[in-house]
């Protein structure tokens, strides 16, 4: 499981996917999120701007990202 360490209080979902290298651009992030391919804490998330906080887990195409403070 990859970890992203927060610099601020939160990171937005689209930014987290890009930071982890799971998508190449914001446009790609928007597409995969709106198509329901991304899970946050086990539930499908459709908002690219969803704020992720310490302890949240993002799942996408078999990869998981843990958000850490």
Task: Annotate the PLM regions.
Residues 23-25, 58-61:
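Short, low-complexity, polar/charged sequence segments that are solvent-exposed and flexible
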Residues 1-11:
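A detector for short, charged/polar N-terminal pre-domain segments
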Residues 9-51:
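A basic, amphipathic helix-loop patch mediating RNA/tRNA/ribosome contacts
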Residues 62-67:
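Short, charged beta-turn/beta-strand-edge "cap" motif at the junction between a beta-strand
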